[in-house]
């Protein structure tokens, strides 16, 4: 398992690099559509540096495999605990999110002091990134708190110029919705718990934006991979005695 996780860590590292490269290219280079007669090397450069969205999908699949798989394992072993699960997940998310919000505030305010119009969308067409005239940077307390509790793209915009914060909101709601749905269908769950789970799931599905829910389908692919690996292991254990001498 450790050998497999090393490969997953390498894959996550590569995906993170692809995301950074795409954001950097969007800031430094014109879009591919604006190029005139690009050569093969230029096309290759834009292809390799344009895989940021696909890399985020890889993150979602890996998250579904690791986090969703841990939920399945805990339920199967009878060791499931909402308290322990939420504590682990919230800690992992906030360790990244809180520093990101504070750094965004610091760098945005520093940048705003030197070029305020850039944070109002004046350079959007030039850099193909950042705030737009219709949606300028928002550093309000309400937006900060909304992002802290993963409500960006739902009730508040992403904080400041940190647009990639949308992905953390997606992750949080997938972490919450998946075990609720799973517990509904687990055998032995009390009827009262099933009803509460159904109500919570219905509220979340109604409340969450459609693009976020569609991303959840990608997240579930990772869960599916975990489940298939489990089935494969069970089949190997069942068939192994037939091949013993």
Predicted regions and their residues:
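Aromatic-enriched alpha-helical transmembrane segments of multi-pass intramembrane proteins
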Residues: 9, 15, 139-245
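Short helix-coil transition/hinge motifs at the ends and kinks of transmembrane helices
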Residues: 30-46, 74-79, 114-136, 232-239
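Generic alpha-helical transmembrane segments of integral inner-membrane proteins
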Residues: 17, 98, 102-106, 110, ...
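Functionally critical transmembrane alpha-helices in membrane proteins and complexes, commonly lining
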Residues: 6-73, 93-97, 214
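Active-site alpha-helix of zinc metalloproteases
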Residues: 18-19, 83-84, 166-167
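Juxtamembrane transmembrane-helix termini
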Residues: 55-91, 96-119, 223-229
